[in-house]
């Protein structure tokens, strides 16, 4: 105050970019990158996200990942007719899609490695991919607007675990330094929890929209449990006591897959 210096709103821009990367307004034509259709959805979601950063706090940090919380609330309140996460499937293999994967992967690996958070992304993906593989092997499938029939088997697994949208989630959302559980062991338990709860919630869904929202919701739940996760992380023996039963129960629940009608 009174310094005459205008601060660059880097944090708000990052939150807004997170909202923009994930959100899609139905009816927008593919390739119309400069469309202003549904601009108020983006603006309201970004504003809610930024506001939550300063209102819902635990000590000196926000309790929830701001863009993640804003997105989940927007999707649940507005529904798929007004606000929809980007499709999990981004099209047939092409030069453009290859470049997209390369940019996301290279950027994610470099940034998370420099922040010392790469292990969180790797642990999350390993657990999530394994549990999702169990669901796929047991026959779980979903409906999607880009598929004429149910998405199942290898197609289901690869679409859910290797989607550019999921890569954005694991590289740039769950690794937010301000909302990751503190401590090495706490951070690892945090990654396992997001992956396990995410896989469980995803296995209960039969539509692509619900699948995407379920994964995002898992991070909201785990961030809310962060104090307990950090407490467990402070005592190494508790990690196995908590993580193994949770993963085991999840595997059992995955054994009863839901199929799209």
Locate predicted features.
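Loop-to-transmembrane alpha-helix initiation sites
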Residues: 39, 92-99, 120-121, 157-163, ...
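Glycine/small-residue-rich hydrophobic helix-like segments
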Residues: 140-205
């Amino acid at each position: 105050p009174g310094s005459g210096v205008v601060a660059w709103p880097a944090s708000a821009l990052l939150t807004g970019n997170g909202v923009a990367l994930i959100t899609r307004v139905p009816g927008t034509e593919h390739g119309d990158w400069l469309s202003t259709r549904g601009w108020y959805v983006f603006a309201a979601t970004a504003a809610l996200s930024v506001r939550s950063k300063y209102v819902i706090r635990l000590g000196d940090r926000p309790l929830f990942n701001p863009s993640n919380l804003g997105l989940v609330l927007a999707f649940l309140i507005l529904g798929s007719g007004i606000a929809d996460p980007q499709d999990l499937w981004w099209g047939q293999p092409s030069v453009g899609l290859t470049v997209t994967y390369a940019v996301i992967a290279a950027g994610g690996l470099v940034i998370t490695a420099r922040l010392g958070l790469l292990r969180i992304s790797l642990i999350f993906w390993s657990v999530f991919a394994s549990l999702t593989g169990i669901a796929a092997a047991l026959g779980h499938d979903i409906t999607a607007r880009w598929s004429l029939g149910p998405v199942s088997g290898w197609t289901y697994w690869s679409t859910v675990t290797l989607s550019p949208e999921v890569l954005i989630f694991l590289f740039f959302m769950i690794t937010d330094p301000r909302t990751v559980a503190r401590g090495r062991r706490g951070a690892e338990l945090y990654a396992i929890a997001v992956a396990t709860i995410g896989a469980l919630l995803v296995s209960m869904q039969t539509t692509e929209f619900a699948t995407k929202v379920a994964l995002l919701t898992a991070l909201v739940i785990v961030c809310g449990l962060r104090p307990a996760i950090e407490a467990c992380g402070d005592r190494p023996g508790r990690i196995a006591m908590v993580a193994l039963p949770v993963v085991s129960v999840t595997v059992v629940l995955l054994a009863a897959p839901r199929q799209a009608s």
